[in-house]
């Protein structure tokens, strides 16, 4: 029995060492995108990820372990919006690729929001908030929005934002490389909400933007945020393994991020 357990452990370790995130551009290039996404549930996880921390990774792990989604597509805010002080998107993308390097059910990409929409969506005849819309290109693909409770609570107060949030609107020229482009690029049918410390979404009554909240997730890192990580670094404190993964830590050190 012990020998069998050792063999199984070795197999798991070998598989883990070979596992890696899926790069959307590679799926397109290799002609595997449709086979990968058809009849699948895809979590669409957008955020600043400045930097991506262990709380983000835990949210993704829980979604996949609980079979809430088949894959999770991670997409950073590109910038151009009211938050002017984000780290350059290319550096944040580098950190995301490092953070999720060994997650075989995670999809990462460096495509702009317009390129992302062009790959995953096709034009629809209907209008959303009076604007041309899009729908999924592949049969049976269902997208589920993954958002933080802060986003859910803040956005729920703004009817204008609610009317377009993750509804799949054809991206106009001015938003092709913009945070708003990522927000409107893909229509989601439901939401998974990650709870932040001190937040309650009871007031939403299980619905956000006229679509159901299918799951709320509490992580072991509920008090951890990108803001907290940045403050730790700025204050000169050590960034240990309880905050970010080793790959992300190395990139932060390489670029001397968050020193000011």
What are these regions (language model features)?
Residues 1-21:
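Classical Sec-dependent N-terminal signal peptides that target proteins to the secretory pathway
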Residues 21-260:
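Nucleotidyltransferase catalytic core that binds NTPs
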């Amino acid at each position: 029995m012990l020998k069998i357990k050792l063999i199984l452990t070795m197999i798991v370790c070998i598989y883990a060492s070979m596992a890696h995130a899926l790069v959307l551009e590679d799926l397109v290039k290799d002609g595997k995108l449709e086979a990968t996404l058809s009849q699948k549930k895809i979590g669409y996880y957008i955020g600043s990820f400045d930097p991506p921390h262990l709380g983000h990774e835990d949210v993704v792990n829980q979604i996949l372990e609980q079979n809430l989604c088949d894959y999770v597509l991670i997409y950073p805010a590109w910038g151009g919006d009211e938050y002017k002080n984000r780290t350059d998107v290319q550096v944040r993308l580098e950190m995301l690729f490092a953070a999720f390097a060994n997650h075989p059910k995670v999809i990462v990409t460096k495509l702009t929001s317009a390129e992302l929409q062009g790959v995953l969506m096709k034009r629809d005849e209907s209008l959303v908030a009076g604007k041309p819309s899009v729908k999924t290109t592949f049969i049976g693909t269902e997208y589920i929005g993954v958002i933080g409770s802060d986003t859910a609570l803040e956005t729920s107060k703004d009817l204008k934002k609610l009317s377009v949030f993750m509804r799949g609107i054809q991206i106009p020229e001015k938003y092709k490389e913009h945070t708003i482009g990522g927000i409107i690029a893909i229509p989601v049918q439901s939401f998974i909400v990650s709870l932040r410390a001190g937040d309650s979404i009871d007031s939403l009554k299980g619905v956000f933007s006229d679509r159901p909240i299918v799951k709320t997730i509490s992580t072991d890192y509920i008090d951890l945020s990108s803001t907290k990580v940045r403050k730790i670094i700025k204050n000169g404190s050590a960034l240990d393994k309880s905050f970010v993964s080793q790959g992300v830590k190395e990139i932060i050190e390489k670029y001397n991020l968050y020193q000011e």
